[in-house]
Structure formats: C-alpha cells, structure tokens
Amino acid sequence: MALTGNKGEWSEIYTLLKLLGEGKVYAGDQHMNKIHDLFYPIIMILRQEKEGNFNYKLQDRDVVIQTPEGEELLRIPASVFLVEAENLLKAINENDGAFTVPKIEAFMNRIYCHALKAKSSDKTDIRIILHDLSLIHI
C-alpha cells in the first residue's frame, strides 16, 4: 500500500534525507537565520521503525545503514540522499492535501525507512548524534 501523507509528514522524511545528505546541522541566530560557518557534524541518526531500530552512520562520503548491533545493511553515497531530498522538496511544494510520492517511497524502502512519522505516542522521529567541535581543545 502506498504511503500517503500531508506536507508536514513528508517534511519529516525530507529532513532525514537532507541531514544525511549534508552530514551536518547548522546553527542559527536569534532570528532563526542559518549561520553558514557554524555547524555540527552528524555522527549518526537513529530511527525507530516497526521492524526495529536503524542507525544511519556517516562515514567519509557515505551513509552506512546499520542495525543497533553494528551490522552493516547498506552503504549509499551521501550525495544520493541530497538528490532524493531535492526531489521530495519539489513534490512537497507541488502538492496539497494528502499525496503519494512513489519514487521517494521506493528510496525509503531501500534505506529501511517504512513510515512517514513516529507513532502518535512518540513525538521523536529521529535522534541525532552530533560532534561538538567546540569540545576539541588543542
């Protein structure tokens, strides 16, 4: 059955794809404007699915999808995630109400992502482990 979601639900997947593609989270100022030269590299994103938990680990220029035990399931260039994020953003901007995005759903299945959002009892879709560069002392 095809995944159907509204703009907000698809935006959660867009965020996952964009973060994995860029590999970093940018800081913002008090007006929520991106500070381009201040960012935190992403070490890993954790996502809970019905089938279990999956770790999306950034290694070099790849996203490595693993089980919590560290078993590698799939390795994909991070650049592919950026392309898919842009395709999804285009679909989000072109649609209203509830809609499907079959090509993105196919990619989601490939990367062990089978739901648009977390269970209603859990408001956390993803957990991000960051590398805080300010903690490095030379």
Positions of the model-derived regions?
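Short, surface-exposed loop/strand segments
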Residues: 1-134
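Conserved small/polar residues in nucleotide/adenosyl-binding loops
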Residues: 136-138
